[in-house]
């Protein structure tokens, strides 16, 4: 059983009552850093974080606390976050933004751009996905922070599942595997997400709790899919919303998720 810290409380996100007014960032991040340090001290496996600018600011601040205590933080980074690419284009233009995604030097950019022109559509997509993942990884990592998992945002996962473009999700899994990070597929349709056909080790992350809150399409069908997934040793399961937005106690939740063979 692994436990991961989630970032929603640090940014005022609550799926039951919606977003709430936030305290000053300095005060909020001080408290968040304390929680992050405590999660490491209590054996949490990592921290799932969205790749937006505030997420980066939180990691930068947490790094100072980590350095003081000589601790290491493992990140599971949720991508894509559109504003990251928007910021690149706004700051550097289309060509400049592409250059920063593909290569840090002029010669490297020319080489990468030339290579893209002669790629197949699938190869082109995978090259861009890989470059984007590598850029995000480099942005968040430092001596005390390692990004060892990349999580495909459920908006994109579920859109691809709905369109039956399973190939796009598998390409994401392949790109992560190629650069040595764990691919995580976040979905609100876990039954379909667990049915993806690939032998590459990956994680399926979904809402799961005893109340059936935000569990789709139903708690019974997800339970059955979890049982069937037990035969797929290369697929791990992570559960979100285990407290059902505060409607369940931690004491009530842990035995249930442990029996279900999912990490939280």
Residue ranges with predicted function:
Residues 12-24, 47, 120-127, 205-215, ...:
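Acidic/glycine-enriched edge-of-secondary-structure segments
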Residues 19, 141-144, 148, 155-264:
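Beta/alpha (TIM)-barrel catalytic core signal, keyed to glycine-rich beta->alpha loops juxtaposed to Asp/Glu
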Residues 5, 75-77, 185, 239:
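Structural beta-sheet core signal
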Residues 29-36, 41-46, 50-54, 67-163:
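Active-site beta->alpha loop and helix N-cap motifs at the rims of alpha/beta catalytic domains
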Residues 58-78, 181, 235:
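Short acidic, glycine/proline-enriched helix-loop-strand junctions
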Residues 4, 46-48, 151, 205, ...:
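Conserved beta-strand positions in the central sheet of alpha/beta enzyme cores
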């Amino acid at each position: 059983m692994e436990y991961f810290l989630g970032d929603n409380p640090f940014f005022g996100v609550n799926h039951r009552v919606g977003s709430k007014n936030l305290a000053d960032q300095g005060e909020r991040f001080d408290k968040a850093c304390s929680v992050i340090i405590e999660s490491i001290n209590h054996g949490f496996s990592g921290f799932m974080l969205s790749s937006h600018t505030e997420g980066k600011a939180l990691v930068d601040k947490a790094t100072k606390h980590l350095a003081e205590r000589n601790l290491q933080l493992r990140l599971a980074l949720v991508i894509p976050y559109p504003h990251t690419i928007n910021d690149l284009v706004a700051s550097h233009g289309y060509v400049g933004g592409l250059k920063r995604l593909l290569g840090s030097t002029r010669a490297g950019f020319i080489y990468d751009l030339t290579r893209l022109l002669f790629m197949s559509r699938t190869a082109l997509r995978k090259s861009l996905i890989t470059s984007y993942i590598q850029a995000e990884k480099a942005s968040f990592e430092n001596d005390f922070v390692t990004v060892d998992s990349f999580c495909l945002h459920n908006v994109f996962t579920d859109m691809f599942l709905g369109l039956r473009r399973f190939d796009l999700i598998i390409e994401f899994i392949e790109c992560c595997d190629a650069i040595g990070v764990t691919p995580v597929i976040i979905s609100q349709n876990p039954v379909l997400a667990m049915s993806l056909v690939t032998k590459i080790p990956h994680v399926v992350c979904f809402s799961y709790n005893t109340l059936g809150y935000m569990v789709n399409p139903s708690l019974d069908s997800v339970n059955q899919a979890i049982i069937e997934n037990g035969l797929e040793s290369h697929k791990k399961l992570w559960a979100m919303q285990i407290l059902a937005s505060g409607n369940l106690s931690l004491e009530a939740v842990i035995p249930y998720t442990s029996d279900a063979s999912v990490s939280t």
